[in-house]
Amino acid sequence: MTVRGRGPERPAHLARRDFLAIAGTGLAGGTLAATGVTGLGATPALAAEGRPSPAVAARLRVGYTMPTLEFADPNTRSALGAAYESALTDLIGINTVYAEPSTYDTAGLLSYPPGTVVRAGGGYPSPQRWTRDAAVNAWNAASLVSPLVGRNTLLAMVEKRPDGSLIVQQDNQWWDQIIWVVSAWNHYLVTGDSAFLADAYQTSVNTMSARQVQNFNAGLGLFEGPSFMNDGIAGYPSPPWEPGIKSSFVLDYPNTNKIMCLSTNCLYYGAFLALDGMARALRNTGAAASYRSDAARLRDAINKHLWRTDAGSYGYFVHGAGQLSGQLDTSEEGAGLAFAVMLGVANPDQARSLLDNAHWEPRGIVNSWPAFSMFSDQKPGRHNVCVWPMVHSMFGHAAAIGGRTDLFARAVTDLARLTLGSSGDFYEVYNSKTGAVDGGWQTDGSGELAHFTSQPSQAWSATGYLRMIYSGLFGLNFTENALRFAPCLPTGWGQLSLVGVPYRNATFDLTLTGAGNHVVSCTVNGRPGQAALPAEATGHHQVRITLDEG
């Protein structure tokens, strides 16, 4: 069990621009020239971890391909380019680390080489075998830019049970486990790795079965457990928070194991759909149909118990025990709203409404809102009215999916500015009013409010930005039989290109012109066609898409 909080001082690591210079990259002529860097040694992060020297680590290759982001408009380049450079460096040069077999390969599933995984980030002690961070980072970007590292990062979270069967590592943060299923299905869609699919399906079936037995509330049709993001008590109002408890961990507070949260239940819905997809891909039609039915019932329950018709949005959680049992907490949960749109829990009308009504702070989307009674503008709650870039980025992607080009533009530029204000580093948490690096306030082991540290070089903050670029701006939508393009290009950003993108056995360059999210025309290698590449594509392809507001 790991609660994100205080940690040791930041480890030394290779400077961002130094890393990209070594990798043969740079920032010139409107181009982040980071194309096609493969076989790149993982030595910067290894050094930061106290791992083998470059000579010893030479055999440990990460195999990344870093797509180039090209800008026709210098203002757009100035606003967004440095953050893209920093995000790639954070993922590849800082947070890709050696996977010590005794720690990370307990199930015997990792590949050596590359022998690396994506860790959570700076400031926290090693090892960082954290399911939630691993799944988010693979889902956001790692599975695309390095399928082998993405695969290792996911499989490092798997353990073998005494009977030899596979399951996501079991601990007392059970609500973290199910996002692994969503991320694993995405990895298969991106890579087409059938060997991975077989292990992922077994792992996902066993993980879901365990959670259904232990954490499903049959009366309400929802899964119990804290919010996806909020393992710290600062993410909850009173109740369940109460004074005098000497802990920051959510489960140390009464009845928190019984709450039923929007974000977590949306992820279970996504996991059921992922299991349906995996089962179909493995030709297990009976299991697929069962998982589809489970998904439909859960979606109905979420919309019955958590949708607020009066507010045109979702509430945060349903109390599962105590005096408020059965009542909906009406706070707004940033990750929950994002997942409701991203995973399809919200119908189109609901998605439009919640995007219209979502609360923005001056520097972005926050973890939860409004401020709970124990916090204030001077002492913002760590998991309350603070900007976590990972959550903010998920909401940005949701805005793109929902066709809100304006909100998507705001999300991307807000995070780029936060990063610029913190010397190009992707920190863990920011003050939602000022944009300063700020870990927020939370009850600690003394039972009193304490100011926590915002840790540097957090991989999921960086991959969140990459998610907004790859999946939001360029609209990379991976399906079983094709990569489909659904871009979201804000007005005034000018022509943009993503060059050298890997997709299974092919690569492609994608150029966007116009503005909006409606595809007016698409050419593939100069010929008019659908905005898609088939999964069986090979070689290199040129894709050009013209957009308007529709």
Residue ranges and their predicted role:
Residues 1-18, 25-29, 33-34, 38-44:
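N-terminal secretory signal peptides
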Residues 32-38, 145-149, 345-351, 403-406, ...:
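Short helix-capping/linker segments at secondary-structure and domain boundaries
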Residues 127-242, 261-269, 386-399, 405-408, ...:
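Aromatic-rich carbohydrate-recognition surfaces in CAZymes
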Residues 265-305:
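Active-site neighborhood of glycoside hydrolase catalytic domains
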Residues 394, 398-550:
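Non-catalytic C-terminal accessory modules of carbohydrate-active enzymes
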